[in-house]
């Protein structure tokens, strides 16, 4: 029997989705299907980052196949595409050695912000599921841009630096105030090959928490072991990559699931695994 198509409204929050999954599953699922969808749907063609309407169509195809409870847009990937080869921006980011200057310059670039807002606006207004934006946590973003200051060592960056960075991020997020956003996830997971560094808890980012509260966005943070939501007892568990590859993997306990579907997964295997999620 075909299930009802999910719809979203400005009243929907990620916390609501976790409490009552619109897909009808017993536990809500948040999928990062970018690599898988690029492999299965685009089949080697480039991801249409430069055409928001084409990207929304590509994304909707993947959503229709996988039926997650939200539409997750990773802005770090979008930033990566839009800033690639932008030497003028990089020069500006390297103009001062002060900690956080590079990140502040990145988030203050008018041309970049215009392109990002146009893209997110099309995405948010065409998505058929509640929209959740994912960005690097302020500490992760600070680490990722710190080399522009002339210092490659990020070990001295601390929670105070991260809190200062969160002010730049919260100011930047105001551009999305008028969009139907259900949640904001700060990706604080350690990048492959990187050292963990100091852990900064979600509570440190008061400016972002205040903004999210004002906009009625559910705020969460993805740490290496689990995901948690601000002011909510719900804990998110990660679906292991092996689950999608057909191995006998037991799912961890959690109030909601987050999963990145690998590009090597077969469509038949993925569909079979989706059945086990309800």
Predicted segments, located by residue:
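Alpha-helix-loop-beta-strand connector modules within alpha/beta enzyme cores
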Residues: 109-128, 197-221
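Glycine-rich, proline-tolerant flexible connector loops at the mouths of alpha/beta enzymes
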Residues: 51, 70-108, 183-197
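Catalytic-face loop-and-helix region of soluble metabolic enzyme cores
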Residues: 218-278
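N-terminal basic, low-complexity leaders that serve as flexible interaction/assembly modules and, when applicable
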Residues: 2-80, 259-278
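Alpha/beta enzyme core
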Residues: 166-183, 205-208
């Amino acid at each position: 029997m075909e299930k009802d198509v999910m719809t979203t409204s400005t009243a929907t929050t990620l916390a609501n989705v976790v409490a009552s999954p619109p897909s009808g599953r017993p536990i809500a699922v948040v999928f990062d299907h970018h690599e898988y969808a690029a492999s299965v749907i685009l089949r080697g063609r480039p991801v249409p980052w430069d055409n928001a309407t084409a990207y929304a169509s590509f994304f909707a195809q993947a959503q229709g196949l996988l039926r997650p409870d939200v539409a997750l847009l990773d802005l770090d990937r979008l930033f990566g595409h839009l800033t690639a080869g932008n030497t003028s921006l990089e020069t500006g980011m390297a103009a001062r050695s002060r900690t956080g200057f590079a990140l502040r310059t990145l988030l203050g670039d008018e041309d970049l912000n215009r392109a990002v807002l146009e893209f997110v606006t099309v995405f948010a207004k065409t998505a058929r599921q509640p929209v959740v934006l994912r960005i690097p946590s302020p500490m992760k973003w600070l680490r990722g841009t710190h080399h522009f200051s002339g210092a490659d060592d990020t070990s001295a960056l601390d929670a105070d630096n991260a809190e200062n960075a969160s002010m730049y991020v919260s100011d930047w997020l105001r551009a999305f105030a008028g969009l139907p956003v259900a949640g904001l996830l700060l990706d604080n997971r350690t990048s492959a090959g990187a050292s963990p560094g100091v852990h900064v808890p979600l509570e440190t980012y008061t400016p972002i928490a205040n903004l999210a509260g004002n906009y009625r966005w559910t705020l969460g943070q993805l740490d290496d072991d689990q995901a948690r939501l601000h002011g909510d007892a719900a804990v998110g568990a990660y679906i292991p990559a092996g689950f999608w590859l057909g191995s006998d993997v037991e799912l961890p306990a959690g109030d909601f699931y987050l999963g990145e579907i690998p590009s090597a997964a077969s469509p038949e295997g993925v569909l079979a695994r989706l059945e086990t999620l309800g």
